[in-house]
Amino acid sequence: MAKGEGNVLAQHKKARHDYHIVETVEAGIVLTGTEIKSVRAARIQLKDGFAQIKNGEAWLVNVHIAPFEQGNIWNADPERTRKLLLKKREIQHLADELKGTGMTLVPLKVYLKDGFAKVLIGLAKGKHDYDKRESIKRREQDRDIRRVMKSVNRR
């Protein structure tokens, strides 16, 4: 876990399988009161989510935050678009990277840091099927090598 990263509430585990993560950026999320209560209860799904930049602002799209059970009329739409809090320089850098390169912004994890909800956004390029097979093959080979080295070291 990176320095300052507190309690991880949600992870997009398949993101590293489906994408080559080039760079990561930490961003704050603008949430309503009932949404932060649901996030603290770890009722958030990042699976279909992505981030986009519109008019110089970063937005988190398709991230599902379940309605808070005691929220009643104050609950917001679970799939609403949420604003990300980034510095203007960071937004400009990400916008430059996204222009015409086949890159996308993918939420990797949501966690609490000093009481605030943060999202780790990855600048990613999609993997092809053969890239995924290569990753699996490489992981299996590394596992076999570790297994053999472990048995050799025991002798």
From Swiss-Prot:
Organism in which the protein naturally occurs: Streptococcus equi subsp. zooepidemicus (strain H70)
Domain of life: Bacteria
Gene name in the database record: smpB
Location(s) in or outside the cell: Cytoplasm
HAMAP family registered for this protein in UniProt: SmpB
GO CC annotation terms, alphabetical: cytosol
UniProt keywords, alphabetically: Cytoplasm, RNA-binding
Chain's role: Required for rescue of stalled ribosomes mediated by trans-translation. Binds to transfer-messenger RNA (tmRNA), required for stable association of tmRNA with ribosomes. tmRNA and SmpB together mimic tRNA shape, replacing the anticodon stem-loop with SmpB. tmRNA is encoded by the ssrA gene; the 2 termini fold to resemble tRNA(Ala) and it encodes a 'tag peptide', a short internal open reading frame. During trans-translation Ala-aminoacylated tmRNA acts like a tRNA, entering the A-site of stalled ribosomes, displacing the stalled mRNA.
UniProt protein name: SsrA-binding protein
